[in-house]
Structures are given as C-alpha cells and as structure tokens.
Amino acid sequence: SYGHTFSDYPWHFHQQQAKAGIPNDEKFTHSWKYLILISLSKIILNQDNSLPFNDESREAMSKLEAFIVDAYGSRDPDLTQVFNPQREIRLKPHFELNFKILKAGASAESISIADLPTVIQEVNAQLMKLVLASLNPEHKYFIAFDQLDLGFDNKADDYISRLIGLLLAGRDINIAAKNAQVKFLVTVFLRDDIYNVLRFEDKNKITENFMSLIEWDTPRTTKTLKSLMEKRFSIVASDIDIEQDVKWSDIFNETREMPGHQSKYDHIKDRTYLRPRDMIKFANSALAKFKERLNSPASNTQDDKR
C-alpha cells in the first residue's frame, strides 16, 4: 500500500501537466493516472516480495523496471519529482507509441516532462498493462489519497479540476484492475462538504457505484470518534506493555464539565470539526500540557493529573 497526503507536494509541477483542448473536468485525469501508476510501480518493484509470481509477471516487471530506472534514475523514485519540468523520460524502447502525435521538434526517443501531456494517454495505457500484469492476484494493493482539503478553495477552478480529475482517474483505474482480476484499489478520502460542491458529468455514477460514506457521531450511525480514539489509546498502551483496553474516561476526567456544561468529548469534538487528525492533535496537545503540569512542583493533586 501507499498513502499520499500532499502536505509537501509540488502542485506547481502538477499544474503544468494540465492537458489542453479537453474539458476542465478531465484535464488532470491523465496526469493523476500517471502518478498513481508510478506509485503502484514503486510497490511492485520495492515492497511486494512475492513478485514476480509467474513468467508473465517477471516479463512485465522487467519492462516496468527498465522504464522507471531509465526515466527517474532509480527503481524507487521520489514522487514529488515525478513531474519536475527539468526531467526528460525515454520513450523508446520501452513503449510502442504513435510518435506522429509528438509536437514538432520533439524526439521520438525521449520527451521532456513539459511535453508529456501530448503522449500521456498512450504512456498510461502501456504502463497500465505492465503494472496489472505484474501484480500478484492473491495480494491486495492500495493507493490512498488524504488531506486533499488542505488549502481548499471552492472558488479556485484549477483546485476543483484537480479533485475531479483524481476521482475520475481513480474510478478508471479501479475498473481496469477489476477487469484484470487483480485486487488493486485507488482510495480517495474527501470531506463530504467538498465532494458536494464538485460538479461534473459522471458524478452521479461515481456516487452510486464507487462512493462509501464514512461518518461518525450522526443519527445514522453508532460509530463515534470517541471509539476511534479509544482504539488508538489502546494501541499506544500496548506499545509500552499495558495490555488492556484504554477507555476515554481513563484519559479524560468527564466528571468535571467544561464551560457551558459541555463534556470534554463534546468540547473537543466541536473544536476539531469531527476531523480525526485534528482530534488526535488535540489529544496530543492535552498530553503535552499534562506532562508539563505533572512535572511542575505546584502540581500535587489527582485532579491535576486527569
């Protein structure tokens, strides 16, 4: 599996990969597919020790490795540099492409990343064949995208286009993987308020066939962020040889209400907007303050330690 958070991703490089002459909703679809396929190539070449699992897989992996190493100088390339405009990638002898589509002055042997959008559909098609043929059908593979809400601006057309392109790319690759009978899934974690503002032609189909709603603390579910945090507390406790389930009340003293007669859980929940990562940050901040007070000479009471 591989996870993308994009906190330090060079969006300005990706921005230059917009494919011209097609609708805005689709202009980033092919560049997302390329990034996903390169990510999956990294898993194939560096993580799954069961590969190659047969002769077809061995042949596909050999071709895939030759392209990746030739293009990026390593079988484990830095994904933040995939679209670096200073880079060139060799097309021959790795891919059989229609080189007539290259713009004037471009080489059939290699192409600059700046010119990649002119052939990216053909490159993706070849890459797709290689990665799907390489995968072990008994294993499960995941590429996940998260924190796409960082810097969200519903008035920024390119931001919206990038999100739509990612959803379309993930949908297309998931369909291809299913048809190839391999267990590979592209997963995009996106806040529902952001998803709701997206407008594109295939949205209804994606909503009906490819979307799962993950929610907590709503009338529709019994799942809560409190239970999620308790699981994390227990995992941390097991790391220090505490073999027991850790409850929320073991960490936070709920007998003492917050201002406004709120429980500590409701207080934290309201200030983290039901975002798990923000609740984790809040809990870590509370832990840091607890340690400060614990080490303070003025802290002597049990209440100070809850």
Where does each model-flagged region fall?
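Short secondary-structure boundary/capping segments
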Residues: 17-22, 158-161, 200-207, 289, ...
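Conserved AAA+ ATPase small/helical "lid" subdomain
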Residues: 49-53, 230-299
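Short, solvent-exposed secondary-structure capping/transition elements
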Residues: 41-55, 153-157, 176-182, 198, ...
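Short, solvent-exposed segments of well-ordered alpha helices
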Residues: 23, 27, 114, 118, ...
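Amphipathic alpha-helical scaffolding segments
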Residues: 3, 51-63, 160-168, 284-290
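P-loop NTPase nucleotide-binding core
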Residues: 1-141, 151, 195, 200
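Short, intrinsically disordered, charge-balanced linker/junction segments flanking boundaries
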Residues: 1, 303-306
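The catalytic "switch" region of P-loop NTPases
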Residues: 121-261
